[in-house]
Amino acid sequence: MDSQQDRLAKQVLIQKSFESKRLFLTILRFAIPTFFFALFSAAYVFVDQIMVIKFVPHGPLNPDSIFTDQALIEEFKASAFYKGGDIPNHTELTASQLVKTVLNISQPIVVILNAITIFVPLGTGVIFSKTIGKGDEKKIKDAWNTGLVSTTLFALVTQIIVLAIAKEWLQFNLDKVDEQHHVQVADQFQHFFNEKAVAIGSEYVYILIGFNIIPMLSRLFFYLGQSEGRQLFIAIVPPLSNLLNVLFVFLLVRFSTLGVVGSAVAAILVYFITFMAYVVYLISLNKRGLTYLSLRDFSFKRVSFNLFLVISMVGLASFFRNGSLSILNTFYESFLVNLTKTLTDQSDTFYLVLLTGPIAIANLTSAAIFGVLQGVRTVVSYKFGQGQLADIKRINVYTLLVCLVFAALLYLILAVGLGKEILVHLFDTSAATLMLANQFSLIVQAQVFFVAIGATSQQYFQNNNRVLYSWIVSLMQGVIVFVPLLFIFQAITLQTKNIEIFIWLLTANAALAGLINVLIGQVHIHFFMDKYFAQKHKSRIVQFIERYS
């Protein structure tokens, strides 16, 4: 059992972190570290994409690469797709474009992996913060034990499921058409190109999926550490790990024949290093008696199935959001490829390739905004545990302002200020398509403003036991608003025969969903929050959550 001195040390640390009279500074103290944590965690994939695009294909940066345009053609000639005839000059279907296509069709699976990664850990973090706010040591220990076991088991089960459907998902992302026996050489090469992209993409995502348990446990340790008021060490690890990631990707891509797969191997190595850093830190805290994450007192007897259900209900909103966005990306890319074939004489993946950079940056900035919200979520959960509803209202206003400021900074830097330079130097956008790609980038990255205002409602409902509302707002952008808009934009694009209209879908969807979400959240906060918490008889779901957390 913890000694009285150990308990006092932990309580002092928590009070210093959470109970400052300057609430806005408390928000920043938690939001800034989680912003950088989320930014650099998302940058793993972002940096991988850049390094792969720059170093995998044969070029000045990698003159020894075996991934050349000629090698691609020779492989096509030796494949079952080639039925004879002269091979046309494919200016778009090059080794470089193959790499970009692989990254694009893999992106939705990477997004769903992120959804899986944060599902149970985030729910555990919210419950853990609430129990610390209440000061109930029994429930604190129950949350720690249940969260650790649940994260491990959930990781193993989901890895098996996603591995089983990964290849078919990649094929759907590319809208792979049925192979025909008598087609023109141009179509033959397109079929070969698509099949090659799916094969490489499968190897890439299999590695990331197979080891996804490592980043899941790292996330768990980060969320729980922050719930105890710790910021410095847990926030420093991701940036340092990201630097290692750049080094490993360079070595494996530049000096091996692994190609795109090399970046996945590098990511797993870095995930493992990050995980071990947190484990060593946790052991150090245990030895000094400065953490509730006790390894010595861990017991399977404290694992509660009912608490796991509570954790799942809370974390499900974040899973729904990331998962639905993965489905959104899949359908958007599939419809875009179909519209490209129908309305233009470009290759199937022409516009898909142009959007590689803009979509990657948009995903990065959205992840960073959700990092800000994670820091806020920790504070709100603690305040909720203490019953400080007035502070929760003030935090909501501060959160909206902070998220908009961060969104504006990200957009001005990454879209406006450095937009063209990023597209040219990091994503190898050609001079011929730079103006169009930059136009798309400005449009697509504008989503970050609406993500910033809409996501505050999800955070509010998650932390205040209103899980049904949190599920609704989390599905707003990826399903509820997106599905009708998808068909509306498709119809308008076909009617006007202007495919650039379809590019606006992502931002229009984010704008409408964000405005609806913030309206729902603000109405509940100002008109229903006080009445709801004053009620003695609450819904069964809320009673269940309050009983076990």
From Swiss-Prot:
Cellular component aspect of the GO annotation: plasma membrane
Keyword annotations of the record: Cell membrane, Membrane, Transmembrane, Transmembrane helix
- Give the stretches traversing the membrane: 27-47, 108-128, 146-166, 197-217, 233-253, 265-285, 308-328, 352-372, 399-419, 434-454, 472-492, 501-521
Work out whether the entry's keyword set contains Transmembrane. yes
Q: How does it sit in the membrane?
A: Multi-pass membrane protein
Question: Which molecular-function annotation in GO is an example for this chain?
Answer: xenobiotic transmembrane transporter activity
Q: Name one Pfam family in it.
A: MatE
Task: Report the subcellular localization.
Answer: Cell membrane
Q: Does the keyword Cell membrane apply?
A: yes
SS bonds (residue pairs): none
Principal localisation: membrane
Name the record gives this protein: Uncharacterized protein MG447 homolog
Q: Which organism is it from?
A: Mycoplasma pneumoniae (strain ATCC 29342 / M129 / Subtype 1) (Mycoplasmoides pneumoniae)
